[in-house]
Regions:
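Bacterial N-terminal signal peptides that target proteins for export
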Residues: 2-14
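N-terminal mature-domain "stem" immediately C-terminal to a signal peptide or N-terminal signal-anchor/transmembrane
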Residues: 27-65, 70
Length: 406
């Protein structure tokens, strides 16, 4: 059951009402710009004291300081950030999905100005603070976070930073930020072949689906046995379509070879009581004879001569060809073992940084970038983001300052 606190419902409704009632063209002076900035960042009206202080900041030429004041409001975390993050946590992009460890971890990282790249590689997890009377974190359910949300505690003060490995028991070297949270695993390691984790990470954190990175020039040597080389009896379909996604995706998704989301298929088909499973050193899957989870070898008869995953070694074939323009880091090798290093590869790309800025721009400005002025501003905010510790609050502040004058 989806649990949405009464406070969150009220704030969501207020956000919609304020957005409709306060058109950009209505604002001119510092107080009007401050009011607009506060509503865009929080969805609620500022107090007279906060409005006055923000207006003074704007009048003195420091709109960023005004935005920082606005973000001290609980609604920035409970509504604005939650609205941004929640769709990333499920395949349907449902904005009203229950709070979980994926959502809470991102919100906590933003609050604490944690380098946002750690979202895909860090040994990091945010839980409800001790002393709140919540059920303990459980690897096999979401009760802790649903109780936190139902109680209506402000996330700005209720979240506590911990290491993922100490809470879940996952080895530190196997942690990979939100990808290895229970919420992430339930959504994207559920059934299938773990390619979903790669695809949705690409969509949510590089702002690109597979069609946008389609490249038929990459070698097909790592495409697995479960991909037909002649769909419908026509090999041209594989050569012109399938290869364009799988040649790059499959060698990257191999990083997830040791992960699975275990659940009772018959009695718990949606995995509400499922848990992340990881084959550590010395653990052997009887179906594969190695640490590789059995799901990675399914449908092997589709094309028996295809690639058989032996381990979790990944390689980024997109460092060459048209996808080199995603801006891969020159200091990283472009290959490695496991989800952590693969997450670092994605998070250190230029595409990752620009994606975060673009998402915030759309949320705060209530529109997509429209012209060269917008695009230039996104470029400058992205440069600031990457040069100053990947602080997402800074992105919000600079974006709100840009839109406040519209």
């Amino acid at each position: 059951m989806k649990i949405i606190s009464p406070v969150a419902r009220a704030l969501l409704a207020t956000t919609a009402c304020l957005s409709a009632a306060l058109p950009l063209s209505a604002f001119a002076g510092p107080e009007e710009q401050a009011a607009q900035m506060h509503s865009r960042l929080t969805g609620v009206k500022p107090s007279i004291e906060v409005l006055t202080a923000m207006a003074q900041d704007i009048a003195s030429g420091d709109a960023g300081a005004a935005a920082e004041r606005a973000m001290e409001n609980d609604a920035f975390y409970d509504v604005t950030l939650k609205n941004l993050v929640t769709p990333w946590t499920n395949r349907d992009g449902d904005n009203f999905a229950p709070l979980n460890d994926y959502t809470a971890t991102v919100i906590g990282m933003v609050r604490d100005d944690v380098d946002f790249r750690q979202i895909l590689s860090g040994d990091i997890l945010y839980t409800g603070a001790s002393g709140l009377g919540l059920p303990a974190y459980n690897n096999a359910n979401n009760d802790h976070y649903e109780a936190l949300e139902a109680a209506g505690y402000p996330l700005q003060t209720a979240l506590e930073r911990r290491t993922q490995s100490s809470v879940t028991g996952l080895p530190s070297e196997a942690t990979a930020g939100v990808m290895t949270t229970r919420g992430g695993a339930k959504a994207f390691f559920y059934a299938g072949t773990n390619r979903a984790m790669f695809r949705f990470t690409l969509m949510n954190h590089l702002c690109r689906d597979l069609e946008q990175v389609h490249d038929t020039s990459r070698p097909p040597d790592r495409i697995r046995q479960d991909v037909s080389r002649s769909p419908g009896g026509d090999s041209r379909v594989f050569q012109n379509n399938c290869i364009g996604c799988h040649s790059g995706m499959d060698p990257m998704a191999q990083a997830f070879a040791y992960y699975n989301f275990e659940y009772d298929v018959d009695n718990d088909p949606t995995g509400e009581n499922g848990r992340l499973d990881y084959n550590g050193a010395g653990e052997i899957d009887p179906a594969t004879g190695s640490r590789v989870q059995a799901k990675n070898h399914i449908n092997s008869a589709t094309f028996p001569y295809g690639f058989v995953i032996p381990d979790d070694k990944w390689d980024n074939y997109w460092r060459e060809g048209p996808n080199m323009h995603l801006g891969w880091s020159e200091v990283l090798p472009g290959s490695g073992n496991g989800a952590k290093s693969m997450g670092e590869e994605l998070a250190n790309s230029e595409a990752f940084a620009q994606c975060q800025v673009t998402k915030v721009f759309k949320q705060v400005c209530l529109r997509a970038p429209e012209d060269s002025s917008d695009r230039n501003r996104i470029d400058s905010i992205t440069d600031s983001f990457t040069s100053n510790g990947y602080r997402l609050k800074q992105v919000y502040a600079e974006t709100a300052a840009y839109c406040a004058g519209e």
